[in-house]
């Protein structure tokens, strides 16, 4: 099935002046500007199916296959819930810290067309510094639930607050003037772009809020992994990938390392702790309907149940996929090949962009 992807030229300037964006709990002014050019790409996607006779993976005693990366980890890590932290992603927050250690990095649009990220960590105790941490948006609760993760945030929108309180969701609710031992502010940036945590503080906050750390009984993970690195069958060339979000995510495939190197805002995205550029084995694009639910603050809602289209990118190739999710409370998002089979992704770190249906993804050779 052919899919034509067209990037329509445009200029977007968005500025938001409010309190916690949606909900007016926290003062902020954020402005972004993006410019795009018209590009047309045609892809021919073929179904990727499980190879017959694939060598069975032997997992050593005391080890397990990570639910997040498909890599071999200590069994104890798979027995506890990961932690998902809301990450500030405006230029004043750059470079971010610790997110290069994330197993999965989500990015989605919030008010004013800006984006925020959610970094998911399985081995969070070892974090030296992570942040800047920012306020919650209600649909990020669903992203965290997809990974069975404990959600951490500094502040919240009114919609996130209502949902957390009405549904009794236990999160790491770091609030200004609250539990100072669970976070700290750096002195090299101005608020609200200077809130951070350490691995030790994350562990302390989990205890403070009494969050259950045990994975659901018999949980097998929502992602399906190849046993070894496998190029997507019949994929279109994807040596570079550009997504028309305001942060201008740009990926370049490094064939020697077998990973995509990530840039944004026209510069390599660097982890301030390590000095390394962010890299991912997998890129997953999920198109979903966005709706403005507060015109004054441009607050967004995302329809994350039902089904929709998407794209899986790895090893320099891209294929069309679909996604489906029956309900927010008990189901997880499932990625499928075009014939309805469960998508298998490569072992390693993943970047997941949940974007409006009219946003464009541009691939090049």
Locate each region found by the language model.
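Bacterial signal peptide processing site
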Residues: 23-25
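Bacterial N-terminal signal peptides that target proteins for export
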Residues: 1-9
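C-terminal motif of bacterial Sec signal peptides marking the signal peptidase cleavage site
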Residues: 18-21
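Ser/Thr/Gly/Pro-rich low-complexity, disordered linker/stalk segments of secreted
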Residues: 44-54
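A surface/extracellular/periplasmic glyco- and lipid-processing/surface-interacting theme
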Residues: 32, 36-40, 53-104, 111-365
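Processing junctions and N-termini across compartments
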Residues: 13-16
